[in-house]
Curated annotation (Swiss-Prot):
Its EC number is 2.4.1.227. Pfam families: Glyco_tran_28_C (PF04101), Glyco_transf_28 (PF03033). This is UDP-N-acetylglucosamine--N-acetylmuramyl-(pentapeptide) pyrophosphoryl-undecaprenol N-acetylglucosamine transferase. GO terms for cellular component: plasma membrane. The lineage of its organism: Bacteria, Pseudomonadati, Pseudomonadota, Gammaproteobacteria, Enterobacterales. It is found in: Cell inner membrane. Belongs to the glycosyltransferase 28 family. MurG subfamily. Cell wall formation. Catalyzes the transfer of a GlcNAc subunit on undecaprenyl-pyrophosphoryl-MurNAc-pentapeptide (lipid intermediate I) to form undecaprenyl-pyrophosphoryl-MurNAc-(pentapeptide)GlcNAc (lipid intermediate II). One of its GO terms (molecular function) is undecaprenyldiphospho-muramoylpentapeptide beta-N-acetylglucosaminyltransferase activity. Coiled coil: none annotated. It catalyses: di-trans,octa-cis-undecaprenyl diphospho-N-acetyl-alpha-D-muramoyl-L-alanyl-D-glutamyl-meso-2,6-diaminopimeloyl-D-alanyl-D-alanine + UDP-N-acetyl-alpha-D-glucosamine = di-trans,octa-cis-undecaprenyl diphospho-[N-acetyl-alpha-D-glucosaminyl-(1->4)]-N-acetyl-alpha-D-muramoyl-L-alanyl-D-glutamyl-meso-2,6-diaminopimeloyl-D-alanyl-D-alanine + UDP + H(+). It comes from Buchnera aphidicola subsp. Acyrthosiphon pisum (strain APS) (Acyrthosiphon pisum symbiotic bacterium). Pathway: Cell wall biogenesis; peptidoglycan biosynthesis.
Length: 354
């Protein structure tokens, strides 16, 4: 039997790349051949090749918060990227092209449509990004993590890796747990400057109550470590990137983090109370992602403009392990654990029509 082939388009941020990688690895297990389209010097260029997946690089940038100069020359980059992806499609002849949202998906989505290759989209967020909004008008099939985001889209959930799904539930994790409250701090795959600045101060004021496992991002590791060391806070674990995030979730009583779609999905699947500081996009995309968990009492949302040391200290002082256990159970009730199977069924069904 000739194996099916798929091109996955995702790049720029972990929120697009990691769900795409989960899908890619599952498809490979099922005998599919996978190629990837991304950009150089970005998260996908560092991660995807490690899994033996061939990645093709295109030159394209996002338009959000860009300069006037970049806006003027952006059509040139888009056109070049379009022809680059079209050449890849013509050469490799995939059965399916899957766009995970973000600027990397744009040129390839149009190229696949122009080449009459089925275009599938997956939207992770509660508010669709610009690229997926545009491409949803020409796509063969739309998938979404939550209802009502893209037109005529099937709700499938967000795919997460099996190691996260296998994390013990809150009842088993919190059983007989004692000692300092364990707080996981993650600013997304790139880290977060504001959390790196504030959390050492919080740790100093609550050093008798809290221990942090803090992901700083690659660029601020040494700077953040110096802040902790200056305050003589040696009990905390400070790292640039947590490779085994499942073990970190299993360890934690609470997480302080951004509210990217994948992070929110993972927290729900694991069952973990959260303090969310949404990235302040104009469309409040991350705020919307976190609202369901806040609504059921599993999380608190703090706008970045209101974030300060005193506020975090007051919230943490109001919590104990019993309260965090209740928050964790509430979060666990919203977890979607079969997303990868739902997505595979959609891909497989469309591929049989080609």
């Amino acid at each position: 039997m000739i194996p099916k082939k798929i091109i996955i388009m995702a790049g720029g941020s972990g929120g697009h790349v990691f769900p795409g990688l989960t899908i890619a690895r599952y498809l490979i297990e099922k005998g599919w051949l996978v190629n990837w389209i991304g950009t150089k010097n970005s998260i996908e260029s560092r991660i995807i090749p490690k899994y033996g997946i061939k990645i093709h690089y295109i030159s394209i940038k996002g338009l959000r918060n860009t300069s006037l100069k970049n806006l003027i020359i952006s059509p040139i980059y888009i056109l070049r990227a379009y022809y680059a992806v079209k050449k890849i499609i013509k050469t490799w002849s995939p059965d399916i092209v899957l766009g995970m949202g973000g600027y990397v998906s744009g040129p390839g989505g149009v190229a696949s449509w122009n080449c009459n290759i089925p275009l599938l989209l997956h939207e992770q967020n509660k508010i669709a990004g610009i690229t997926n909004k545009w491409l949803s008008r020409i796509s063969t099939k739309n998938m979404q993590a939550s209802p009502g985001v893209l037109r005529n889209a099937e709700v499938v959930g967000n795919p997460v890796c099996q190691s996260i799904i296998k994390v013990p539930n809150p009842i088993n994790r919190f059983k007989n747990r004692t000692g300092l409250l364990r707080v996981l701090v993650i600013g997304g795959s790139q880290g977060s400057s504001i959390l790196n600045r504030i959390l050492p101060e919080v740790s100093f004021l609550l050093k008798e109550k809290i221990i942090f496992w803090h992901q700083t991002g690659n660029y601020e590791l040494e700077k953040t470590k110096k802040k902790y060391n200056k305050l003589r806070l040696n009990q905390n674990l400070i790292t640039s990137f947590i490779k085994n995030i499942a073990s970190a979730y299993e360890w934690a009583d609470l997480i302080i983090c951004r509210s990217g779609a994948l992070t929110v999905s993972e927290i729900s699947i694991v069952g973990l109370g959260a303090i969310f500081i949404p990235y302040p996009h104009k469309d409040k995309q991350q705020h919307r992602n976190a609202e369901d968990l806040e609504l059921i009492g599993a999380a608190k949302i703090i706008d970045q403009s209101n974030l300060n040391t005193k506020l975090i200290v007051n919230i943490l002082n109001s919590l104990d392990r019993d309260k965090l256990f209740i928050m964790a159970k509430k979060a666990h009730s919203l977890g979607v654990r079969d997303a990868i199977f739902n997505i595979f069924n959609v891909i497989n069904k469309i591929s049989k029509k080609t």
